[in-house]
């Protein structure tokens, strides 16, 4: 009787701070005016990983979303709301688990330690064959370096974009060190601008009317 092949395991880790900023951009400032679809994102990740999967193995994705704020269910200052509940349901529908930090995060000085520690744990116990990380932040560059040293491929989903806000031009860029340590970098802003990739949006994209007047900008990092 032939030996059953172990599945090819994908660890999909989502930096909630990055996704929050990216979602805000696509909903309110991008021409398509829509949030990102988690089902579309999951399918996209599976397609990107498939070429690396041996033909005799099946693909299994384990998804983790790391929220940038404490769980409001245990925080009297920030009561749980229905929009967050719906957000969690969207994640769970795609097999993605929500993680909240135990303490408030300062995104200007550090990344999400739970995200970092979980990737290290999965890598240490060899529970994943490939990592897909959605993030633009340099706080995770050392984690990407660690994966390279352990010969675990990292596919990085990142964004570079700019948009006007309050007479300023907001810039959002993927950290260069994080990008360089990745086995493969995918410029998601280019993917999502492709008219054939509308499945990555919750709603059918509709174009926003662009302002006809000229504006002067001051530059500000997002």
What kind of region is each of these model predictions?
Residues 82-221:
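Nuclease catalytic cores that cleave nucleic-acid phosphodiester bonds
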């Amino acid at each position: 009787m032939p030996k059953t092949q172990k599945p090819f395991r994908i660890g999909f880790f989502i930096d909630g701070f990055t996704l929050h900023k990216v979602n805000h951009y696509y909903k309110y400032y991008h021409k398509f005016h829509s949030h990102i679809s988690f089902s579309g994102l999951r399918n996209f990740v599976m397609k990107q990983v498939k070429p690396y999967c041996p033909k005799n193995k099946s693909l299994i994705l384990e998804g983790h979303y790391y929220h940038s704020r404490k769980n409001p269910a245990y925080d009297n200052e920030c009561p749980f709301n229905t929009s967050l509940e719906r957000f969690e349901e969207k994640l769970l529908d795609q097999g993605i688990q929500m993680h909240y930090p135990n303490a408030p995060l300062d995104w200007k000085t550090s990344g999400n330690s739970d995200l970092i520690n979980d990737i290290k744990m999965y890598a240490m116990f060899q529970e994943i064959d490939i990592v897909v990380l959605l993030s633009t932040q340099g706080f995770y560059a050392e984690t990407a370096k660690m994966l390279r040293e352990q010969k675990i491929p990292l596919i990085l989903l990142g964004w570079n974009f700019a948009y006007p806000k309050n007479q300023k031009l907001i810039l959002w860029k993927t950290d260069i060190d994080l990008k360089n340590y990745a086995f493969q970098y995918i410029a998601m802003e280019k993917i999502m601008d492709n008219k054939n990739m509308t499945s990555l949006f919750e709603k059918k994209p509709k174009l926003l009317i662009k302002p006809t007047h000229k504006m002067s900008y001051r530059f500000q990092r997002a």
